[in-house]
């Protein structure tokens, strides 16, 4: 007899969901429930969602030299990718040149090395920056890398007002989950808001921050904690920007978010829907913006790298496919699908192509893109959405009581929370309560890698 899991990965009970009450509380499409494109944006930020325009297929890439990464970029664009996403190596993320002693052994290892504007020229050689949007996963030295990008756009004759893209620029999650920071928290926050102010006046189509739950989820937090911690960080950035003299409508329309898409399909869909509604409520209540876009949560999604296994790696292609499906069902604005071999090393050209094809198959063959918020009205999904809003909202209030996200970072509050959730997850793996096919269970099977 199959042993079913009674709880989601965040600990929500599945077996005692009050289906009828959930339907009554959540409402149904066409029954007075807000439509897609209408506040609070639970069902999506655009009325037609993917019926009129697909999400941006933005594969994360970067390795070795700028020249080699440029070749991968151009290959992906030729294969149908619709946006760029740059991975930088650790020395670049820490503001170190490749010949710095502390960079030894790390140059070009997990991303591309950018030491100078010459490297940036090579990175975007033969790529029209006026025709493609570029996301740069860079935080502590975000101002420097953006300055290089703008300089290359200037050389190409692309107006600064026309360049489109994103810098992650989310330093709080570096203190919480990654550790790639350079300056103390308060000074780092000042640099973050300085970039927002510059873009307001010079690059109005540039997303000045991508508030990231992804890295905290990879470090071990739950879906509920991912939403709560991410939106709490976003509130801190918003308050800091306003304290610096910016108005909410000066920068909030160009704030973006970045979430993980993990294994629990329905919980992940509910998570995305909940994050949109909760962010709308938080912004409207505290800041009262006039522009509609100031309270809309736009987000990028990446499939969960932490779920990939080195054992039986072809299984990862299946994991990535259904994680990508969750992101699309949840209304993501852009998506990166991991390559099946990433637990073993940098993706090959072939595995990167398969990852891109996964998105294209979902877009063109499944019919999912032809319906808006197709799981709306599901008793289970609506109940999960409501619970995540409630529990994540409680977490945000607790962080505010403790002085806000910045003060909690200094005390280690978020870090401790993530460590505890990661430990719980590890215990479930070790006891067999959580299955990982090919690594924890069914390990005796060997899948062929050649025909």
Name these PLM-found stretches.
Residues 186-196, 313-316, 392-410:
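Phosphate/diphosphate-binding loops
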Residues 90, 167-172, 210-218, 252-262, ...:
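A glycine-rich phosphate-binding loop feature that marks nucleotide/adenosyl-phosphate handling sites
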Residues 195-196, 200-238, 318-392:
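Mobile "lid/hinge" segments at catalytic clefts and subdomain interfaces of large enzymes
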Residues 443-449:
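Conserved small/polar residues in nucleotide/adenosyl-binding loops
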Residues 1-262, 267, 286-289, 293-300, ...:
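Catalytic alpha/beta active-site cores
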């Amino acid at each position: 007899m199959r042993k079913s899991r009674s709880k989601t990965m965040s600990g929500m009970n599945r077996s005692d969901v009050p289906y009828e009450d959930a339907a009554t509380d959540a409402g149904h499409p066409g029954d007075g429930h807000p439509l897609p494109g209408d506040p609070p944006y639970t069902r999506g930020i655009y009325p037609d969602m993917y019926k009129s325009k697909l999400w941006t297929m933005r594969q994360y890439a970067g390795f070795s030299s700028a020249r080699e990464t440029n070749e991968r970029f151009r290959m992906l664009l030729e294969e149908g990718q619709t946006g760029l996403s740059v991975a930088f190596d650790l020395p670049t993320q820490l503001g170190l040149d490749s010949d710095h002693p502390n960079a030894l052994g790390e140059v070009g290892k997990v991303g591309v090395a950018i030491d100078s504007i010459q490297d940036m020229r090579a990175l975007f050689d033969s790529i029209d920056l006026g025709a493609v949007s570029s996301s740069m996963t860079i935080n502590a030295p975000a101002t420097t890398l953006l300055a290089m990008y703008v300089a290359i756009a200037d050389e190409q004759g692309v107006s600064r007002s026309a360049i489109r893209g994103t810098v992650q620029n989310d330093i709080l999650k570096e203190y919480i989950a990654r550790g790639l920071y350079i300056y103390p928290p308060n000074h780092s926050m000042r640099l973050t808001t300085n970039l927002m102010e510059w873009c307001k006046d010079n690059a109005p189509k540039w997303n000045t921050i991508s508030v990231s739950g992804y890295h905290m989820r990879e470090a071990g937090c739950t879906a509920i904690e991912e939403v709560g911690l991410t939106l709490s960080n976003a509130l801190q950035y918003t308050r800091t920007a306003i304290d610096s003299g910016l108005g909410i409508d000066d920068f909030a329309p160009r704030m973006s978010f970045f979430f993980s898409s993990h294994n629990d399909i329905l919980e992940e869909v509910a998570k995305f829907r909940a994050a949109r509604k909760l962010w709308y409520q938080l912004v409207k209540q505290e800041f009262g913006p006039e522009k509609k876009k100031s309270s809309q949560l736009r987000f990028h999604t990446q499939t969960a790298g932490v779920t990939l296994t080195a054992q039986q790696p072809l299984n990862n292609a299946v994991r990535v496919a259904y994680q990508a499906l969750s992101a699309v069902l949840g209304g993501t604005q852009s998506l990166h699908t991991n390559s099946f071999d990433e637990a073993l090393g940098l993706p090959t050209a072939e595995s990167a192509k398969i990852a891109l094809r996964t998105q294209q198959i979902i877009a063109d063959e499944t019919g999912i893109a032809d319906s808006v918020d197709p799981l709306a009205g599901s008793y289970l999904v609506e109940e999960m959405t409501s619970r995540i809003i409630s529990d994540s909202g409680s977490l945000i209030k607790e962080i505010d009581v403790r002085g806000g996200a910045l003060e909690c970072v200094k005390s280690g509050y978020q870090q401790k929370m993530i460590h505890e959730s990661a430990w719980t997850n590890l215990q479930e793996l070790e006891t067999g309560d959580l299955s990982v096919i090919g690594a924890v269970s069914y390990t005796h099977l060997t899948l062929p890698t050649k025909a």
